[in-house]
Swiss-Prot record:
Residues 39-124 are lumenal. This is ATP-dependent zinc metalloprotease FtsH. It comes from the Bacteria. Binds 1 zinc ion per subunit. Acts as a processive, ATP-dependent zinc metallopeptidase for both cytoplasmic and membrane proteins. Plays a role in the quality control of integral membrane proteins. Keywords: ATP-binding, Hydrolase, Membrane, Metal-binding, Metalloprotease, Nucleotide-binding, Plasmid, Protease, Thylakoid, Transmembrane, Transmembrane helix, Zinc. In the central section; belongs to the AAA ATPase family. In the C-terminal section; belongs to the peptidase M41 family. The gene is ftsH. GO terms for cellular component: plasma membrane-derived thylakoid membrane.
Length: 655
């Protein structure tokens, strides 16, 4: 995206390199003048004792006494010169201290002596001694602070805003380039309409929001929406990241905030966009924030609060910000009068994903078999950035195969690349490892096909992918889901344990290949108990504090509880996992023929999908106690867990 201009301010035409070169030339001339012009001719220097000896011997004809030295001329006959010749022996000597007896000594030996008249340039060496050192210091300092600067001294620009300014419509993005977030677009269109027709609102006494905060997971299009607003509104657009306010020097952040708003007022109507606001606006003294009254971030935040609450709401300056961590922002920043409106930009649903795909495939040559609706169904949970990457990956795969257009198989492979990682055909498994992986993946597929809300098993593969996956099972939901019931959570845990259960049932031992499944199953069971309150023993009590609303993978802190409660939580989690493990073993036991047949086909072809896979998994049998377990989470009274009756496990490793 082209940058129209840097911070909009008038600067002097200051060229540090030219200035430094001129200073160097001036210094060289002064040094040459002092060393060669002002000092005059040079003569041999003798010892002061030799000078005294020569005077006593009557060899000295004339002496010139200077403040710092004595210059004397020997008699011509001492060197064999004839009288009247212009050649004479001239020497310099430096006296030892101040010799007050020297005039008397010279008179006694009939030696002429005199002091030279003051020179008209005698002041120049003194002046150079005072002027040249400061000039040298200033020149070095000027060069150091300007060597990395394109214009102006850094000391004079460090407090200026680093915001990039885009002229009217120069972002190159409009609302036609944004899809899948229709509700957010509708809200932001009001901002655009205000900038274009402000009188429509002010004549009724309405006030446009001073600030609009875009919140949502990463990659959902928050920054893209901000660019679209600037492109649609045809007004100057200031863009800066929250981290660009803070620098090494104290007070720079607050100065840059002041400078940013001064520029914005001069360019009004305009939009000021601060990306990653959480880098600047963390709660003061709160969780994830900063402490200390002199903290640079706190000073910068205070200045931002002052500027947002201080400028006239109808001058046409609208502050737009984006963050994926709204829970850590300072409450004073979110109050009405500052960020009046908060717009959630969430992951798109099926229709939104299809609309986003239509935007991103505009410049891509597509084959006739491409069905964007099917692609939208196969990409649940994908953000706008994920879908853009998906289209690009599919185009790259088609180019790698030298195709004239992108076909549906390219998109299917691209989805698997995004979800499971790259294929690693060079990783060769031995027969035992390959057989173990095959039964492991088929175990996932059979158990998952019977669980409620789990979706359809689309593909099973024993080709290694990604960092550590030796195989994978692709199971896609039939629709977008926003709520999950307790029975569906239990079914997901059982599906995760289906791979390990198949290994136990067929081989009598388990491998390390199930470690990731166990980790995910345990995490889900712990949330089942501590966050969702679905345990009958502990009741609807949340033992974890949900903090990260839009960022995944960040653990929630547990509340302070007593040791008895901790023990009860651990037991409840174990009961959930044990019940799911028992149900997975029960399902695979009564469907062992299906497990054997499907695994043999998978070992032969390495990949099973489409109709062939559906026919193999078409009629699985249900354990008699599965419905009761899914509904209540309890097994029949006195029912013994299947895993307790199996042989003791022997740990083997699969690399």
């Amino acid at each position: 995206m082209p940058i129209e201009t840097e911070p909009n301010r008038t600067r002097k035409n200051f060229e540090p390199k030219r200035f430094g070169g001129s200073l160097f030339i001036l210094f060289t001339l002064l040094l040459f003048l002092n060393l060669f012009v002002l000092r005059g001719p040079r003569f041999p220097i003798t010892a002061y004792s030799d000078f005294i000896t020569q005077v006593e011997a009557g060899q000295v004809e004339r002496v010139e006494v200077r403040p710092d030295r004595i210059r004397y001329i020997l008699k011509s006959d001492q060197y064999g010169f004839n009288e009247g010749t212009e050649t004479a022996a001239v020497f310099d000597t430096v006296p030892v201290g101040i010799d007050l007896e020297l005039p008397k000594f010279l008179r006694e030996h009939d030696v002429q002596y005199f002091a030279p008249p003051p020179s008209s340039l005698s002041w120049l060496p003194t002046l150079l001694g005072w002027v040249v050192p400061p000039l040298i210091f200033f020149g070095i300092w000027s060069w150091l602070i300007n060597r990395n600067q394109g214009a102006g001294p850094a000391a004079l620009t460090v407090g200026q805003s680093k915001a990039r300014i885009y002229s009217e419509g120069s972002t190159g993005v409009t609302f036609d380039d944004v899809a899948g977030v229709e509700e957010a677009k509708t809200e932001l269109l009001e901002i655009v309409d205000f900038l274009a027709h402000a009188d429509k609102y002010t004549r009724l006494g309405a006030k446009i929001p001073k600030g609009v905060l875009l919140v949502g997971p990463p990659g959902t299009g928050k920054t893209l929406l901000a660019k679209a607003i600037a492109g649609e509104a045809k007004v100057p657009f200031f863009s800066i990241s929250g981290s660009e306010f803070i620098e090494l020097f104290v007070g720079i952040g607050a100065a840059r905030v002041r400078d940013l708003f001064e520029q914005a007022k001069q360019q009004a109507p305009c939009i000021v966009f601060i990306d990653e606001l959480d880098a600047l606006g963390k709660a003061r003294g709160g969780p994830g924030g900063f402490t200390g009254g002199n903290d640079e971030r706190e000073q910068t935040l205070n200045q931002l609060l002052s500027e947002m609450d201080g400028f006239d709401p109808n001058v046409g300056v609208i502050l737009l910000a984006a963050t994926n961590r709204p829970e850590v922002l300072d409450p004073a920043l979110l109050r009405p009068g500052r960020f009046d409106r908060q717009i959630v930009v969430d992951r798109p649903d099926k229709m939104g994903r299809e609309a986003i795909l239509k935007v991103h495939v505009r410049g891509v040559k597509l084959a006739e078999d491409i069905n964007l609706t099917k692609l939208a169904v196969r990409t649940p949970g994908f953000s706008g950035a994920d879908l853009a990457n998906l289209v690009n990956e599919a185009a790259l795969l088609a180019a790698r195969q030298s195709r004239d257009a992108v076909v549906m198989s390219d998109f299917n492979e691209a989805i698997e690349r995004v979800v499971a990682g790259l294929e690693k055909k060079s990783r060769v498994l031995n027969d035992l490892e390959k057989k173990t992986v095959a039964y492991h993946e088929v175990g996932h597929a059979i158990v998952g096909s019977l669980m409620p809300g789990a979706g359809t098993v689309e593909k099973i593969s024993v080709i290694p992918r990604g960092i550590g996956a030796l195989g994978y099972t692709l199971q896609l939901p039939e629709e977008d889901r926003f709520l999950i019931t307790a029975s569906e959570l239990r079914g997901r845990i059982a599906t995760l344990l289906g791979g390990r259960s198949a290994e136990e049932l067929i081989f009598g031992v388990v491998s390390t290949g199930a470690s990731d499944d166990i980790q995910k199953a345990t995490d889900l069971a712990e949330r089942y108990v501590t966050l969702y309150g679905m345990s009958d023993e502990l009741g609807p009590i949340a033992y974890e504090k949900a903090q990260q609303q839009f960022l995944e993978g960040v653990p929630n802190p547990r509340r302070t509880v007593g040791p008895q409660v901790v023990e009860a939580i651990d037991q409840a989690v174990k009961d959930v996992v044990d019940g799911a493990h028992h149900m997975a073993l029960s399902i695979l036991s009564i469907n062992q023929d299906m497990l054997q047949l499907t695994a043999s086909h998978l070992l032969e072809k390495e990949v099973l999908e489409s109709q062939e896979l559906h026919s193999l998994l078409s009629q699985p049998q249900f354990p008699p106690d599965m419905d009761e377990w899914l509904q209540t989470g309890k097994l029949p009274q006195g029912k013994e867990l299947i895993q307790t009756t199996l042989n003791s496990h022997q740990l083997i490793g699969i690399n």
